[in-house]
């Protein structure tokens, strides 16, 4: 059952709309959801909760291998559940972010989390949100989507998000940060940010989120022959 459960992977750069699309797909299809971008933060928080030495690869590996985490999409929002507790806000703190960066530096921790991510593949299906879901984590996924947008559009979206939260932000600075991250992600030696050869590439620059969701759903139904709802 686990090996044959279908997977829809959604990869792409930050700000392209992956999270919104994946939540909508998971809710529409009633499938499980994996937010790979949050998983290192969840591991970091678990390490802090259990007072595990974050500088010890030996100590982190078993925690990563048995990480008790679920991602729930509901009403367009993502809930991150660690050991039965909603930690959606807690994983976004600076302390957790710094700890996550340390944990991600260990090869054996990365390998343990790779196996843990693959274990999310269960019936009726999985929506996998990330940067290397279709190329590394689920290379055999029947539906692969690469969601992109211009760096200017992504910076604009990020600026609006931050302004809604009351932050005063500089567009040019945001744009420079996004371009720098893009360059780093696309040129890294391990798992660079590139579309899988068999991925549907969607450029959301001039598309509404509803258009993106409908295009992705139509494609998934075509490939998987899913029953129309």
Curated annotation (Swiss-Prot):
Its main location: cytoplasm. GO terms for biological process: nucleobase-containing small molecule interconversion; pyrimidine nucleotide metabolic process. ATP binds at residues 12-20. One of its GO terms (molecular function) is ATP binding. It is found in: Cytoplasm. The keyword ATP-binding applies. SUPFAM superfamilies: P-loop containing nucleoside triphosphate hydrolases (SSF52540). InterPro entries: Cytidylate_kin, Cytidylate_kinase_dom, P-loop_NTPase. Its EC number is 2.7.4.25. Pfam families: Cytidylate_kin. It comes from the Bacteria. One of its GO terms (cellular component) is cytosol. Keywords: ATP-binding, Cytoplasm, Kinase, Nucleotide-binding, Transferase. PANTHER family: CYTIDYLATE KINASE (PTHR21299:SF2), CYTIDYLATE KINASE/PANTOATE-BETA-ALANINE LIGASE (PTHR21299). NCBIfam families: cmk (TIGR00017). Belongs to the cytidylate kinase family. Type 1 subfamily. This is Cytidylate kinase. It comes from Serratia proteamaculans (strain 568). The lineage of its organism: Bacteria, Pseudomonadati, Pseudomonadota, Gammaproteobacteria, Enterobacterales.
